[in-house]
């Protein structure tokens, strides 16, 4: 079998950042997949499932309610390796096009202090596995990275 695109990235060189993982043509539309890399693979500790789950609920809710982008959001969810998230948007975009959106999203998470949307037995299959304080920690750290975002954290290493 062929190696999938995400496994061709040198994870030993990969830093936290906001990357275009791939672009796919679906019918007449382009779908852009973003790699929202929070931790440095194989170097820094990975996120635990509880904070990943909290970030997933908060980011998905935020993005699907963001007036300029909500109609473009197809999916937001965690990477299996627990070092980040994927965001799929309808349209042909580059990292620079969405850095403000992602920064605003993670700022929202960093400042969030209410009940996590969908964190109930009725709404979620594992609602007790949430850690808002750690989600806020990772979000705050990621916002700090995006404050000075440049090509070093928006283009995959060669």
PLM feature spans:
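Active-site-adjacent, His/Asp/Glu-enriched structural segments that form or flank metal-binding
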Residues: 76-148
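Histidine-acidic residue clusters that define the catalytic metal-binding segment
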Residues: 144-158
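Detector for Asparagine
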Residues: 42, 48, 65, 126, ...
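Context-gated lysine
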Residues: 3, 13, 23-25, 70-72, ...
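His/Glu-rich zincin catalytic helix
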Residues: 1-63
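A domain-level signal for the structural core that forms small-molecule/cofactor-binding pockets
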Residues: 62, 121-124, 155-156
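M16/MPP (pitrilysin/insulinase) zinc-metallopeptidase core fold and M16-derived inactive scaffolds
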Residues: 41, 45-97
């Amino acid at each position: 079998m062929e190696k999938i695109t995400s496994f061709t990235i040198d994870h030993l060189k990969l830093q936290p950042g906001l990357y275009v993982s791939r672009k796919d043509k679906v019918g007449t539309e382009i779908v852009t997949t973003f790699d929202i890399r929070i931790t440095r693979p194989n170097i820094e500790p990975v996120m635990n499932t509880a904070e990943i789950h909290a970030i997933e609920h908060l980011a998905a809710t935020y993005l699907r309610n963001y007036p300029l982008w909500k109609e473009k959001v197809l999916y937001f969810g965690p990477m299996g390796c627990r070092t980040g998230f994927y965001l799929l948007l309808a349209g042909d975009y580059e990292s620079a096009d969405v850095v403000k959106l992602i920064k605003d999203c993670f700022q929202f998470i960093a400042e969030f202090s209410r009940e996590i949307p969908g964190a109930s037995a009725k709404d979620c299959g594992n609602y007790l596995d949430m850690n808002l304080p750690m989600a806020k920690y990772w979000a705050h750290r990621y916002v700090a990275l995006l404050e000075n975002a440049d090509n070093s954290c928006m283009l995959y290493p060669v």
